[in-house]
From Swiss-Prot:
Post-translational modifications reported in the UniProt record: Contains two covalently linked bilin chromophores.
InterPro entries named in the record: Globin-like_sf, Phycobilisome_asu/bsu, Phycobilisome_asu/bsu_sf
Substitution effect: residue 159 to L: In strain: NBD
Name of a matching Pfam family: Phycobilisome
Protein name as annotated: R-phycoerythrin alpha chain
UniProt-annotated location(s): Plastid, Chloroplast thylakoid membrane
Cross-referenced CDD domains: PE_alpha
Entry's family note: Belongs to the phycobiliprotein family.
């Protein structure tokens, strides 16, 4: 799984060298942000059901046509699958916060997602709206510290940009 630490070590090993000073500074910065990432991961884990429900609700509020006949959410089963997908991505955000890199999203979420959604007639814009809502709903310090919020929002931005 890709993280700042594994990427740094892999690059140094591939070049047959020890990690450079700048490599080590990057790793140290990553380690210093670890407490904030873990705080964000803990808050997300303890509130994930509400986060997923609110994000999914925001998606269907913004794109109400999705519940029309022939659309991606025209049955309760399809609506449930959309919420399931949002839940899946929020778990991946949690994993990314824990490992300190985008590896979980890259490996289990992004690869081929746009193509799958297009094939199934699921608009990626609806998922983007869900993740943007989850990001924008964050209230510092009510929900988490400022640095934890930066880490959380950064991971959601990564998913949003990957789906656009």
């Amino acid at each position: 799984m890709k993280s700042v630490i594994t990427t740094t070590i892999s690059a140094a090993d591939a070049a047959g060298r020890f990690p450079s000073s700048s490599d080590l500074e990057s790793v140290q910065g990553n380690i210093q942000r670890a407490a904030a990432r873990l705080e964000a991961a803990e808050k997300l884990a303890s509130n994930h059901e509400a986060v997923v429900k609110e994000a999914g609700d925001a998606c269907f509020a913004k794109y109400s046509y999705l519940k029309n006949p022939g659309e991606a959410g025209d049955s309760q089963e399809k609506v449930n699958k959309c919420y399931r997908d949002v839940d899946h991505y929020m778990r991946l955000v949690n994993y990314c916060l824990v490992v300190g890199g985008t590896g979980p999203v890259d490996e289990w979420g992004i690869a081929g997602a746009r193509e799958v959604y297009r094939t199934l007639n699921l608009p990626t814009s609806a998922y983007v709206a869900s993740f943007a809502f989850a990001r924008d709903r964050l209230c510092v310090p009510r929900d988490m510290s400022a640095q934890a919020g930066v880490e959380y929002a950064g991971n959601l931005d990564y998913i949003i940009n990957s789906l656009c």
